[in-house]
Amino acid sequence: KNMAEVANHFAEQGYRVLVPDLRSHGQSEGDSIGMGAWDSEDIVEWSKYILKQDSSASIALYGVSMGASTVMMASGNEQLPDAVKVAVEDCGYTSAWDEFSFQLDDLFGLPSFPALDAANLVTKLRAGYDLKDADALAAVKRKKVPMLFIHGDADDFVPTDMVYPLYKAAAGEKELMIVKGAGHGKSREADPLAYWEKVDTFLEKYI
């Protein structure tokens, strides 16, 4: 439901749209939220699935918040098909570790050690992944997928400062859009005309 507006927009632009639920979201199975660690591998598999349906497809990835970080992590996966031509990330975090560190400090005034280290141990045991492996910053350095980075300058959940190292590190062609007055995940609402003009123009360069 949250992505219905986005899916409708892309459909109106002539794209065929696939909107999968991430693990433990919507109708997808699972009881652990992966923060993009496992989900990014699912995106790779969905991309391969699209190519089985249409071997000539050109694919664009789009995500918001955790979905944005998932897109970035997928973009750095060596198994990602070359048919993925472009990606758009909106307010994604540099890594799950960085995001939880920020939240611990912002909400409780606590350092990451020992609370986050303890939480990470539980995550490894119960969910099977390390929070440090959910690392979008490392991923964008690895593969040259063109990427549009979007962030609101009033984001106090995933701080705006996270977008700058992501943008700087990205190995491929890239653009950065900072939306004035937009909170977390609210850039589309804050300035929809400018938002969609930027997204559509960027995608059209590669698809």
Residue spans of the language-model regions?
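Conserved alpha/beta-hydrolase
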Residues: 7-29
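Alpha/beta-hydrolase active-site loop
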Residues: 32-54
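Alpha/beta-hydrolase fold nucleophile elbow
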Residues: 53-65
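Hydrolase active-site cap/lid region
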Residues: 73-129
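Short beta-strand/loop motif that positions the catalytic acidic residue
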Residues: 142-144, 149-151, 155
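Acidic catalytic loop of the alpha/beta-hydrolase fold
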Residues: 153-158, 185-186
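Catalytic histidine-centered segment of alpha/beta-hydrolase-like enzymes
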Residues: 182-196
